[in-house]
Amino acid sequence: MNDDIIILLSVFCGIFFICFIICSSIALYLWKSKSRKRLVEQYTKEAKQAKKQILANGYKEISEAKMLFLKRSELEKNELDRVKEQLELRSNDLKRNQEIVESKSQRLDASLLDLEKRKFLLDKKEEYLIKVLEDASSLTKSQAKELLIKQVKNKSEKELISILKNAELQAHSNSKMIANNIIISAMERIKVELTSQRTTNIVKLPSDDLKGRIIGKDGRNMKAFKQIGGVDIVIDETPNTVVVSSFNPIRREIATRTLEQLIIDGRIQPVKIENELKKQEQELEYIIQETGLSTIKELNINDIDIELVKLIGKLKFRTSYGQNVLAHSIEVAKLSGAIASELGLDVEKAIRAGLLHDIGKAIDFEKQGSHVVLGAEIAKKYNEDPIVINCIESHHEDKEKESEIAAIVAIADSISASRPGARYNAIDEFILRMTEIEKIGNSIPGVAKTYALQSGRQIRLIVDPLVASDLDLAMILEKMKEEIKNKVIIPGEITITVIRERKETDVLK
């Protein structure tokens, strides 16, 4: 009995559990169905709202596009109306002009008819008068015409000869006046400093006490300047002053700069002098280049070889008849440019030719040949314009002038050279004499350098110790004496000194 009850309870519990599971599943299903329904409703609601928003935005964009289209259409319509109105105005103007032209044409036609009638009447009257004249003069028309032409011709020839003579005199007077005006106008526009070259430089001293140090023990410092620098150091009673003397302006400038630097440094001795001379020589090369660059910049000259620029700078240290060649060349360049401007010619080419016309003087003391020939060679070497080359070749009438610019440069050169005080022949002759002495010395075998000092009355021959021995010094001295007697005229006594010095330098580490 108890077992049956247990079995029944077990069966009942199983059935209850199954029913519970089924009910739970049904409840869960119903709950999920409701949740899904709510989600569907929510998504549907959001989709409807999005649809409404999209439609609203679409309507708004369509409305804006429509408004924009209407405004654009209205503007285009207004523009078309304006163009149409302008075309109508132009059309009306053309119609009025056409009417005016037609009216003028009608008046011209009427005038032509009237002129033809008058011409016909005049021809008739002319025939009548000719007939009357022929009857009165017993000459035909052709005979009277020939007589009249002959009389007029004779009278015209006399008047023409008189007119031509007067015109020739007037043209000659005007051409001379115009030429003078051109040159005067060019000279008025040019301002160039007058520079006369000296053969000495003055060095100011802080005190006279330095003179003894400059002289050195037994005069060795002054000897060093003579032997190495090729200049004379002149010390006299003038207070606080030392004079550097040399006909060669480049050597004089190097020595002056050297002495000034040594005075600042305070150490004045032969070795220091030699080193400083070499240093100042290098610095002067830089100054020469800078001078050339500043010159072409001043004259606004472009596209020029740097080596040619250096030669231009070198002219600063060259003189001709006492006139500084660079200053003279700049003056000729400016005068040439001004005259070319007055005549309507190429100003830049005239300035360039004027500057380079004496470029041969930058090397004529180093090479054989006239400055004209050397200058033309330099210009050809650096590919200058043929007109510029001809200006160099013809400014002293060595060659025929091939252009107006060549004539202008020659005129400007003459103006610059002929100014009062521009040139001094005595100085140039002195420099030529000194140059000739140095050339003679340098031509002797074994001589490395020659220095002409004190107007040529002292000559220093520096011998190359590797080429000439002590035994050769007497022979070199005799050779120099003989050459000087035959080729150079110098009044008074001449002292010739031959110096052979050899130095050995080594560095001990």
Swiss-Prot record:
GO terms for biological process: mRNA catabolic process. Its main location: membrane. It comes from the Bacteria. GO terms for molecular function: RNA binding; RNA endonuclease activity. CDD domains: HDc, KH-I_RNaseY. It is a single-pass membrane protein. Belongs to the RNase Y family. This is Ribonuclease Y.
